Amino acid sequence: MKAIVRIILLSLCLYSCTEKQELPATFNYDTEVIAVFAPRGINDQSSAGQMYKGLTQITDAQKISFRPVFPLTFEEGAETLARLAGADQKGCKRLIISTDPGYSEHLQETASQGLIVNTDSTKLLIFDGDFKHDDVYVAHVPYYAMMYKAGYIAGKMNDVENVRIYIANDNYRYIREGRDGFIDGFSLSKANEVDVYDYSTINDDDTEGFMMRNIAYMSDAHECSKGDFDMILPICGETIWGFLRYNRENPGEFYTIGVGADMSIYSSDVPFSCVEHLDRIVSACVMDWMDNRLEHYRIFGLDEGWVELVVSEQYKSLMEPMSQEIHRQATEKEEHYAK
């Protein structure tokens, strides 16, 4: 049954420009956005969930077609992206979006072989691709500056001495940026070293670290609660929900920094969150594409408000001034780090 559903989805993506009779008269059926998501699935607060929301809203508002693809494996998703990006669909303006950096390596190889189409009718947009190519468009959402601010504020907290960063896999650019930014910011206000735990070192699958909420809840959070760590920073996708669940059930044992969205509503032990507004970012990309001004490489950073550090309500009076005082230095450090 799953195989049949996959075939139907892929068929819709490949031939959707011919499906005109089902669309209302005001609908621009010759313009479509196809987004290939990671096989991890989506929820409202996940990066994929935000992108799905943004794409749904902007395509509805512009009355253009939106075709999401949910592969069962990364291999299947990468093959779908390569096939779509390698076919110029005449008579249909098409934007193909790779929503997950896990596809970057495969797409880089595909581009280097000259197998990606870049025409007025077909363009490929990669989110956080770790390479540049004339036939590929990249939207980069940098983590360094906002994580630098988070590290600086964490180091100023009197009850925070030992911090651990949980990362899913340091092969991902934004994860490396977030890790390094936090460590650099923390070292500015406190001399203690920051511990880093990489989930990819215990998994055969490089993507498993994004989906270990049960391990986080049943094992890793208990380790933190023993007093080894006062604060954790989980840059590991869905895995963060295991830590937040433990925080809710055992308040006051350690702080968890929210990542991706404002997560203060899930636990009082979230002092601040590193937020990326991916719904707005992907909408901006679609509008640029529709207006024929899509940039080959665009950065959606802290200064423009595409990402930000959001302080939880009960900590605002204490931490907002810290966030403001370190803002300029964080952005300058990010510029230097990126070079």
Where are these regions (language model features)?
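C-terminal motif of bacterial Sec signal peptides marking the signal peptidase cleavage site
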Residues: C13-S16
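Extracytoplasmic "Venus flytrap"
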Residues: F27-Y29, V33-G54, I58, R67-A78, ...
